């Protein structure tokens, strides 16, 4: 009978960026927002050429239950709603925004204070997560609100924060846990999952 030697193969982890702090990049001249940047139905554009947007402006509505809204991460003017070739080589609809400064929607709280106490019900929190277009950071960008809706009569008994990267070169989750741990651990308490 053939057997394997003890020890196995240990390929390089390629985590060269694990020790590097998160950096803010310079603004581009134009930002392109694909409407299919998550699993499920693509979002539907709600802006048109010439519209002025700010950071935090909703630019696309979720196109179905398994879909996500999209918000602008730049301020500027919508140049066009057209198509772009995605990473897989397919032509997909997208919103093109010419960047003009750094204005934020007035309704966005940019303070460094974290929410310490939440007075919303779990259902209200899930609705806000859906409205905000929150998706997972994995390759599928799965809409988070879908995962937070257990079947009727069921209740979550524990929360597992999966920070295992799906690709060998990725270290974004690792850096977020190191630099933003206080924000990550605020979320379970908001759902009443901290007891």
Regions found by a protein language model. Give the residues of each.
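Well-ordered secondary-structure scaffolds
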Residues: 1-182, 193-195
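Well-ordered alpha-helical segments embedded in enzymatic catalytic cores
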Residues: 183-187
């Amino acid at each position: 009978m053939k057997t394997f030697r003890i020890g196995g193969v240990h390929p390089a982890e390629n985590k060269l960026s694990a020790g590097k702090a998160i950096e803010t990049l310079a603004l581009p001249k134009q930002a392109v927002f694909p409407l299919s940047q998550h699993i499920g139905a693509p979002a539907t554009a709600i802006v048109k050429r010439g519209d002025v947007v700010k950071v935090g402006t909703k630019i696309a509505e979720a196109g179905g239950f398994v879909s996500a809204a999209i918000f602008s991460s730049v301020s500027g003017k919508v140049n066009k709603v057209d198509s772009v070739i995605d990473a897989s080589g397919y032509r997909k609809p997208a919103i093109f925004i010419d960047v003009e400064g750094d204005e934020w929607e007035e309704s966005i709280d940019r303070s460094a204070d974290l929410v310490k106490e939440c007075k919303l019900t779990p259902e209200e929190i899930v609705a806000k997560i859906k409205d905000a277009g929150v998706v997972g950071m994995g390759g599928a960008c799965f809409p988070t609100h879908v995962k937070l809706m257990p079947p009727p009569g069921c209740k979550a008994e524990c929360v597992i924060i999966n920070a295992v990267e799906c690709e060998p070169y990725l270290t974004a989750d690792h850096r977020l846990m190191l630099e933003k741990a206080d924000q990550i651990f605020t979320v379970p308490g908001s759902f009443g999952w901290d007891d």
